[in-house]
Amino acid sequence: MKILVDADSCPVKDIVFQVAREYSVKVVVVKDLSHEIDSNYAEVITADQGRDSVDLIIVNNTDKGDIVITQDYGLASLALTKQAIVLHPNGWKFTEENIDGLLLNRHINQQIRQRNGRHTKTPKRKSKDDNNFKNLLKEIIVQMKSS
């Protein structure tokens, strides 16, 4: 088991590093050239700038039972097909049951934006989101290590 982090605009990298170190879990952070990330714990992979370059590296390095951290619904969908556990930084899991609805909602919002319309904006991040994420990540690691 390892944790793969989609580092582009990931607000929970420090939490991931802390929890992974606590439970001795390998972390792979994938970023593009426009982001600078230093970690004395995680392996940092830099992808070329380009649409989906980070996503492709993550998917190609994901194995069954790995944990993938992302806000990207498309990447989440691909990681689920590799039988990974996929977490959103707000502390909830992407699942086979919710991914289709999330992708459909994303598509509808894109269509509204293309017509210069408005759509519901994502609420601002709260400290509760960090706590939810940290607790969920710990819970999943404990489950995976005990099975």
Curated annotation (Swiss-Prot):
Pfam families registered for this protein in UniProt: DUF188
Cysteines joined through disulfide linkages: none
Top-level division of the source organism's lineage: Bacteria
Transmembrane segments: none
Entries under NCBIfam families matching the protein: PRK00124.1
Family statement: Belongs to the UPF0178 family.
HAMAP family for the chain: UPF0178
PANTHER family linked: UPF0178 PROTEIN YAII (PTHR35146:SF1)
UniProt-recorded name of the protein: UPF0178 protein Nther_1836
Source organism (scientific name): Natranaerobius thermophilus (strain ATCC BAA-1301 / DSM 18059 / JW/NM-WN-LF)
